[in-house]
Amino acid sequence: MLDILKAIIFGIVEGITEWLPISSTGHLIIMEELLKLDQGDAFFEMFQVVIQLGAILAVVVIYFHKLNPFSPKKTQKQKMMTWQIWIKVVIGCLPAAVVGILFDDWIDKTLYHWYVVALMLIVYGILFIVVENYQKGKEPQVTKFSQLTIPMILIIGVFQMLAMIPGTSRSGATIVGALMIGVSRSVATEYTFFLAIPVMFGASLLKLIKFGFSFTAMQVAVLLVGMVVSFVVSIVAIKFLMSYIRKNDFKAFGYYRIVLGVIVFLFFGIQALLA
């Protein structure tokens, strides 16, 4: 039962941090140290994948009508606009898809270290503050999804590719990239959510294939609880973020990332010195 309670806590953390631009990895790397599941390291990696699936399903549910090109309630023009959204999502995912397929194992083995996570938390925290200060008072060039051009999409896609570095935050990287080229906060955030669907489903499927599907009854319970909690909390987090950015900028998240990065440095740095 203790692992079930831990799964609930992990699900809450994943649901919040996957969509707010504050790095789910940065939080989970500390959580893993404080609340390690008694199921082995391989299972924990699988658990992380499954709770991510719960998070991405929340986006699918919230935006199902907007992203469904087969809806009988849509006119022919609306269906065409929906297909255009998917085309832009697929193009934006290409850089991350190519790098993920070729270098997934290398990234996990080489870059998944606490000091990389801490550094990326701080770097992108500073970026958020700098970009928001630079854009202050300027009218965004892109205020509608339809105004996103192919070059813009590819630039945002490259930022999503860079988010494969642990601690970067996939949502954080793509939002920063979009803001830098004049995309409004609401369009940048929604596009980030849409980009997550194929990328996270693809990444999750890749890891599920690697780890296999053989679990004990307790492990199945832990996976299901974590996924459901992550799904529910993600719905709340997504709705909160879309409401928050209507009146606020992203600087608060930038400051939070810097503080968390320093905490990660201190937490693991002191452990390393005392070891």
Tell me what each language-model feature is:
Residues 1-275:
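Multi-pass membrane proteins that catalyze or facilitate reactions on polyprenyl-/lipid-phosphate substrates
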